[in-house]
Amino acid sequence: MKILFLADEESKMYWEYFKKEDFKGIDIIVSCGDLNPSYLSFLTTMVGVPLLYVHGNHDDKYNVKPPEGCICIEDEIYEYEGVRFLGLGGSNRYKPGENQYTQKEMTKRVKKLWWKLKRKNGFDVLVTHSPAKGLHDGEDTCHTGFDVFNRLIEQYKPRYFVHGHVHMSYGRQFIRLDKVGETTVINAYEKYICLLYTSPSPRDAHE
């Protein structure tokens, strides 16, 4: 399965200079948050594949104008062609507002998923906006990651953990790829493509 991950900044190549051939072979698009809802609607319409999304900390506008034709996977395990995507959007709470959570609040969200996790026998791809604590995160309150994400990775060993929130312009804080045990960690800032094999085959590929 060829997956296009997006986060935080709209790609001019994909929007202003859209060419269908740039999406050849893409099976599904996944947004990790903080993207214009019109951008997401445009992509799912023009590319003609499902688009899954979680909320970033700046996505309160989705309440008024959600991304049309797209699928919100907040607190859900969405299965597509045998691949299970678990969505947990939002950032560490740093001011009053929506799509922000304390460490305790995010832990509570995860605990409520116990039955879905049991029924689906875990998940393959963890899709979040925020990184995990101590993994690709920042030192400031806003960009501190969630510790419960580390526990999810340790317990369920997903193929991928994909997040946004930490931009390339942040310098040393930006790490595109990492590995934690059996899990590949991806910062999806702007765009990132990976090929996830759904049957025994060579290791997954990245672009």
Feature roles, as predicted:
Residues 1-44, 119-122:
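N-terminal active-site segment of His-dependent metallophosphoesterases
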Residues 5-7, 29-34, 52-57, 126-129, ...:
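Active-site neighborhood of phospho(di)ester-bond hydrolases with catalytic His/Asp-centered motifs
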Residues 5-14, 55-144:
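Conserved catalytic scaffold of divalent metal-dependent phosphoesterases
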Residues 6, 15-17, 77-81, 152-156, ...:
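Binuclear metal-dependent phosphoesterase catalytic core
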Residues 16-17, 35, 39-48, 60-69, ...:
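Metal-dependent catalytic neighborhoods of phosphoester/phosphodiester hydrolases
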Residues 29, 48-52, 67-75, 183-184:
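Active-site regions of enzymes building and remodeling cell-envelope glycoconjugates
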Residues 49, 123, 149, 153, ...:
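Proline-aspartate-enriched helix->loop->beta-strand connector
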Residues 197-207:
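Single conserved hydrophobic/aromatic residue that forms the stacking wall/gate
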